Design a protein with these regions (language model features):
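Zinc-dependent metalloendopeptidases
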Residues: 1-309
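Acidic, glycine-rich calcium-binding repeat modules characteristic of RTX/beta-roll
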Residues: 31, 116-120, 124-128, 148-149, ...
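Well-ordered beta-strand positions in beta-sheet-rich domains
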Residues: 103, 259, 341-343, 386, ...
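Predominantly extracellular/luminal cell-surface or secreted proteins
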Residues: 252, 374, 403, 444-446
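Low-complexity acidic/polar repeat-biased segments
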Residues: 290, 294, 302, 306, ...
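Beta-propeller blade termini
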Residues: 309, 389-390, 470-471
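Short, surface-exposed loop/helix-turn segments at secondary-structure junctions
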Residues: 266, 275-277, 412-422
Length: 472
């Protein structure tokens, strides 16, 4: 979605109220009108970090890039918004030094209908159009267009990834079929990445410990308790950019099975009823998620979200390369830390906890919990990479699952470990033993028969382990 045009220095904007503000002929001479208050507010939401409350900041171009916006003169501003009958729909001019550069024009083809450009509300066609045309005025090209730097790859050519494409869903043939409030509520990940490539990334916005929250009944997006996005219907369809700090997605109000993925470029679903209906595509016609994560800017991990507070149903939560804190709360949850030194807390229910790489802390909570380990590298003998289970309770049917690890790679197939209790390694490949101290237990596995541990798991309690406590 990159073009060959961008602004330099402060980007000024204006909402002219008189045709005489324009030095060129054409649009101004064909039913000129000033934009509505709703259009003005939508434009300010998308541009200005200082518009409204601080909750909006991260969703504005000024908030996620280093571009600086300021109110300018109606005759000379870089980006100007107005209405004309000349474009039947809407269009905008790229940045430049020519007279029309940066001007955004909205037509009247949909006047008096639900798609009227004068009535943008987060998630409707008019809102989407304003984001799209502002993108052009700042230097973004069409996502479906092979000009300039090429079109979006086919697997990303949908409004789930960019407001700049005409493709409503993967394979839509450059057409929109979404429901009335089924459009993106913000710039999406490809747009954010392109604008950051042009203007730099702002890591000061929401650089503290920010809490993002969504309401199951209305779809409102809250940032640190203040409403940032008030959609026209109970739909959530946005991308989050966060500048730094230790940040949290608080989804504790949800009673539906959450599907959360904190990895860059991935999407999370809070409630299927809050998914935007796109009219087709690989997810039964719906958007693949409610909230999408921004891509990393040049590999900088400060924009990652670190923590998740789950709901009361059966949640699936995947972390990222940061040190995540993931709390499942009630329900039979599946928690995965991905990379980083994570804290996974299942809460009430029969949970599965998979720390992944890093020295992870695993808390199953009440219920029959399963602690999964899938490779030797995920829990090392060295403390720097060793996982700790804090509440292994055999009487609650907690189990340690090693079944994915091949205990003997010299034999075809996935071999199971042989549990030898507290006995020393004998030199057999695939032996599993444990040591119990006064208040700790250490589990060791030898996969190559050299009588040395190849991985270790720490239990924060003295437990007399038995073969039945493992899934081998």
């Amino acid at each position: 979605v990159l073009s060959n045009a961008a602004w330099y220095g402060t980007i000024t904007y204006a909402f002219p109220t008189a045709a005489g503000s324009y030095s060129y002929s054409g649009e101004k001479n064909s039913g000129f009108a000033a934009v509505s208050t709703a259009q003005k507010n939508a434009a300010l939401f998308a541009m200005e970090q200082s518009f409204g409350s601080a909750a909006n900041d991260g969703f504005s171009v000024e908030g996620f890039t280093n571009a600086s916006f300021a109110l300018g003169n109606a005759s000379t501003a870089s980006v100007r918004f107005a209405q004309s009958k000349l474009p039947s729909t809407a269009y905008a001019y790229y940045p430049g030094t020519y007279a029309e550069a940066g001007d955004v024009w909205f037509g009247t083809a949909y006047a008096g209908t639900v798609n009227d450009y004068r009535t943008p509300v987060a998630g409707n066609y008019a809102w989407h159009t304003l984001l799209h045309e502002l993108g052009h005025a700042l230097g973004l090209s069409h996502g479906h267009d092979p000009d300039d730097f090429g079109a979006l790859p086919a697997q990303y050519n949908s409004i789930e990834f960019s407001v700049m494409t005409y493709s409503g869903f993967i394979g839509s043939g450059n057409a929109y079929w979404y429901e009335r409030f089924g459009a993106p509520q913000t710039f999406m990940m490809a747009d954010i990445a392109a604008l950051q490539e042009m203007y730099g990334a702002d890591f000061t916005t929401n650089s503290g410990n920010t809490v993002y929250k969504w309401t199951p009944g209305s779809g409102a997006t809250l940032v640190n308790g203040a409403t940032a996005i008030a959609p026209g219907a109970n739909r959530i369809f946005a991308t989050v950019w966060d500048g730094g700090g230790n940040d949290t997605y608080d989804l504790s109000a949800y009673r539906t099975g959450l599907k959360i993925d904190l990895r860059p470029g991935q999407a999370s679903t809070f409630n299927a009823d809050q998914l935007a209906y796109l009219g087709g595509g690989p997810n039964d016609g719906f958007a693949r998620g409610n909230i999408f994560n921004a891509l990393l800017y040049h590999g900088d991990t400060r924009s990652l979200i670190e923590n998740v507070l789950g709901g009361s149903a059966n949640d699936s939560i995947i972390g990222n390369q940061a040190a995540n804190t993931v709390r499942g709360y009630a329900g039979n949850d599946a928690l995965s830390g991905d990379r980083g030194n994570d804290l996974l807390d299942g809460g009430v229910g029969n949970d599965s906890l998979y720390g992944g790489a890093g020295a992870d802390r695993l808390v199953g909570g009440t219920g029959a919990d399963r602690f999964l380990f899938k490779s030797l590298a995920e829990t090392t003998v060295a403390t720097t990479g060793r996982d700790t289970i804090y509440d292994f309770v055999a009487s609650q049917s907690d189990r340690i699952d090693l079944s994915t690890i091949d205990a003997n790679t010299t034999v075809t197939g996935n071999q199971a470990f042989v549990f030898v209790g507290t006995a020393a390694f004998s030199g057999g490949k695939g032996e599993l033993r444990y040591d119990r101290a006064a208040s700790d237990t250490y589990i060791y596995g030898d996969v190559n028969g050299d009588r040395k541990a190849d991985f270790a798991i720490h239990l924060d309690d003295a437990v007399a382990m038995q073969k039945g406590y493992f899934i081998l």
